[in-house]
Amino acid sequence: MTDQTHIRNFSIIAHIDHGKSTLADRFIQICGGLSDREMAEQVLDSMDIERERGITIKAQSVTLDYQSRDGGIYQLNFIDTPGHVDFSYEVSRSLAACEGALLVVDAAQGVEAQSVANCYTAIEQGLEVLPVLNKIDLPSADPARVKSEIEEIIGIPAEDAVEISAKTGFGVDLLLEELVKKIPPPKGDAEGPLQALIIDSWFDNYLGVVSLVRVVNGAISRKQKITIMSTGKSHLVEKLGVFTPKPLDKTVLGAGEVGFVVAGIKDIFGAPVGDTITATDRPTTEPLPGFQKVQPRVFAGLYPVESDDYESLREALNKLHLNDAALHFEPEVSQALGFGFRCGFLGMLHMEIIQERLEREYDLDLITTAPTVVYEVAKSDGTVVPVDNPADLPPPNEIEEIREPIIEANILVPQDYLGAVISLCIEKRGVQKKLQYMGGQVALSFELPLSEVVLDFFDRLKSCSRGFASFDYEFLRFQAAPLVKLDILINGEKVDALSLIVHRDISMNRGRDLVERMKDLIPRQMFEVAIQAAIGSKIIARSTVKAMRKNVLAKCYGGDITRKRKLLEKQKAGKKRMKQVGKIDIPQEAFLAVLRVNKDS
């Protein structure tokens, strides 16, 4: 067991692409966690999706032994965190297990919105924040400007910020020395009753639930009986250890240490994240303050293409939920798509990642409906109901008002692109709250409806500022707005999975775009297919997929007109009969058309 004064627990926080994972690689190399043969780039981004997209999704923890210049050996437990706004809850969970954080800032790009948001989270939790300037070897690096930006925008002193290049390894050993000096050691009670916080869990098919824990007080050892406080169930610890990034078994984890625990828990919900572990024979009375529950902001329906896969989808979602506490799902039935699940996500990136993981790791074919946000509906009898699926909207005569979620978006943008960003926000029905010049950057604050931000705001913001603007957001309130439900009818039948809730001012255009787009996607049938967009009982747009027809007059050479007319009338009657009983299969592209219309309009 390591003496607490020689333990340092810290996280690395930064904006996307500022070099967190590369810096983690250098730490592992310097402290000899892996041999050169095992070393790979971004060794901690273990999921295929993480490596392909070049982003960190799951926070990973590593324990390294560092021989410092004063001769002492320090145990460094560090957690590599994601930088994307959709995964900010992963960051706050990692910070709860640390005493300090490294704020990594790109010396060329300067401070960006996520670094600010994550840094405030760290300061709120009382952590010691060390600013670090990375990519110092770039020709465009400007350390003096970035240091003044850190002081102006975030408000922490940065004149002593360590300058490093994680790619070449320059300055990293100096950073390790600073880290040991400035980040405080843990202050747990090594002799007290056991209290350990579950930072993360995942499901292993052989071991059951594996939990990543931070021991706060006491110690946890092999063959000890432990109790999970929220469920009250006891389990026997089968193995425990640390990641160096490879799993290394140990017999004891002492106060202040971070490691993994396997206790043969087979129930997926047996060790929820944020829970407290204690010893069965000498339990603690108080659980540790856990994490606040994250509320999903974006909802979409996930349906298996083959209805036989429904159970496999349920099992896959359960396993993912253990690893990703922010995923929310419940069963639902659609007339068009059969049985499936209504899933809640933190944002569009989160939704894409979950869908990709389900398709890759669990080998499922899925249909996804267009994402929607949660609306509040005030009914005429005085009750207020949340609605996350347009199909669940009460009839118009029962609705007093519909309220949509409003967020506060904090945007950092270079001055040259300010005009383009402001006009984008106004187009999205935004209200400007604040504008502040800081060095070469401008800090903007806008109130925007979440439904306008969910789909493509991030992509459009990046393209209108050439990738320089950055943004993060927080939920403010629900606010009444003139919203209507837009239904799509195919041959007079409503397709529930294609319904949308839209703002009244753009409903006509949205309906027209949508039926035109559907016309190209629905395959031609032997009979005419009418595609209509309706608000309530009023049809606002229509397009028709023309029927394929056989030339019934091909065999008539000349002859009387009545003979030809008889054949044409017979064909017409057949088509009419067909149209009454004909069923149309709607391809997956048609469901995605709803998304694209939202993005293009």
Curated annotation (Swiss-Prot):
Location in the cell reads:
Cell inner membrane
The family database entries (PROSITE patterns) matched by this protein are listed as: G_TR_1 (PS00301), G_TR_2 (PS51722)
This protein's GO CC annotations: plasma membrane
Pfam families per the UniProt record, alphabetical: EFG_C, GTP_EFTU, LepA_C
SMART domains attached to this UniProt entry: EFG_C
Q: How does it sit in the membrane?
A: Peripheral membrane protein
The protein's Enzyme Commission number: 3.6.5.n1
The segment(s) forming the tr-type G domain are: 5-187
Q: What is its main location?
A: membrane
Instruction: Please list the residues that bind GTP.
Output: 17-22, 134-137
State the source organism's domain of life.
Bacteria
Single GO BP term: positive regulation of translation
Keyword terms:
Cell inner membrane, Cell membrane, GTP-binding, Hydrolase, Membrane, Nucleotide-binding, Protein biosynthesis
Task: Show the PANTHER family listed in the entry.
Answer: TRANSLATION FACTOR GUF1 HOMOLOG, CHLOROPLASTIC, TRANSLATION FACTOR GUF1-RELATED
- Give the family from UniProt: Belongs to the TRAFAC class translation factor GTPase superfamily. Classic translation factor GTPase family. LepA subfamily.
What this protein is called in its record is: Elongation factor 4
